[in-house]
Amino acid sequence: MKSTLRHKHREGGTALMIAVSSLVFLIPLVGLAVDAGFLYVVKARMQASVDGASLAAARALNLGQTTAAQADSAKQNAVNWFYANYPAGNWMSRNTTMTTSDTHVRVYDDTVNPNLRHVDVMATSQIPTFFMKYLGVDATTVQAIGHASRRDVNAMLVLDRSGSMGSSCGALISAAKTFTGQFSAGRDKIGAVSFADNVYLHSKPTSNFQSTLGYTNSYGTLNGELDTIACAGGTATPQAIMVAYNELYKLNQPGALNVIVVETDGRPNTITVNFWDGSAAGIASTSNCLDKNGKKKSAGGFATLASLREWTPGYNMNVGGTGYMANIPAGLVGGIGGTDSGTTAFLLFNSWTYVKTDTYNETNNKQYPTSTALSGCAMASNRNTLADLAWLPTTDIYGNNLVNGSYRAVSTSGGKISPISMTQIRAAAFNGVDSAGTRIRTNATVPAHVFSVGFTTSVDHTVLQRIANDPDWMGTSACTTSGQCVVNSGQPQGTYVFAATTADLVPAFLSLSSQILRLSR
């Protein structure tokens, strides 16, 4: 019995010795696990702060009047963001280092894509240990690295200066200048067209857009081309969109973020077409309309094939238009517009489009090209008559489809729009806008995002949703009521913003600029 008790005591002593010996190894292991867990949490917080700092730096690349100033803004923004989220002493850290030097924030151009800038951000900090310090390891240096990129933005503003915008012209100008003020001068390229009965190219996309167009931002305000806009006339929306996109197409920078921003307060009611046809002129046989050369329909309508060939290189010579042009000579094409009232106003113009040359300079009180009725036309003296027209083509001069059975119904006969009525022309204008949006988004060479601003309750929400390809409008009452909103998931998606009053215009343009800048990263 005593022998058994002594044996049990020996076993207990052995177990105690083993347990004590194990603690020698277990305590460091537990300490290592605690320290490692703490370091993991701190590193994750630090990494999140660095990632946020890199994104903040990329966002700030549009702040500053020069590229050097923009780089400085990016660096300072990165530092500010980092320390706001990971202040000195955070989590008992020591010697946290994040400065505006190139060592910690580096801004540089991409070596392949000249329209891409990168920001690399790096921060270090020493994190104290709790248990490992007893083994001679007082602290561990933690490093976090972040990266962000920003594509340059090429944007064209398409601004409605029709008569219905009259009292709101000033608010539109202010909103457009606020938009330009959000982008990176010297890197981004912005241009603008305005439209009524005709389309005016205020500026091709340029990196000097702030001095050319004008701007408003935290640095101040500057007047420019946008301040010369005066509002009067009809709504040639399809033509304006294509003139704007033509400038992006000619710029030919697919590595940039290419954007069209369309603002309108009305409904498209004007199409721009070529009335020449090899077998049948678009002018009725009884019409006395004269073309720009003073000839009647026997000479081929408003534009002869010879004058069609005057178009500068870059235009696809297919009649009806399927390409893009470098310029549009005044008086080349006839155009026709119909008001929304349903009772009045069809006019043909011989000076439908004017594109400003590089050397053309205007000051205030800009004189837009006059849209005059062609000599001899019955509608020159009676705007309610359609007697001059025999038919309309199914595409406009840019190749936009004016007949779309899935959107606005347009009747045809013999491959032409016929009979001609105000309802037909308005529907064709809607289809032209819709077609322009689709062709811009799906162009294989320079695809672009389309954004839109609808102003006042007279606007048609559906067509602006369709050209923007905005999925967020699908559940709205406007879309459910019309049943004609469409989203093409395989195409670039933009945003449609509705501005009910003049006070909503600046917020609407700011909202779009923020979304465009977000896409550029």
Regions found by a protein language model. Give the residues of each.
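Short, mixed-charge, low-aromatic patches
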Residues: 6-11, 30-37, 194-196
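Short glycine- and Lys/Arg-enriched binding-loop motifs that mark or flank ligand-binding interfaces
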Residues: 9, 27, 262
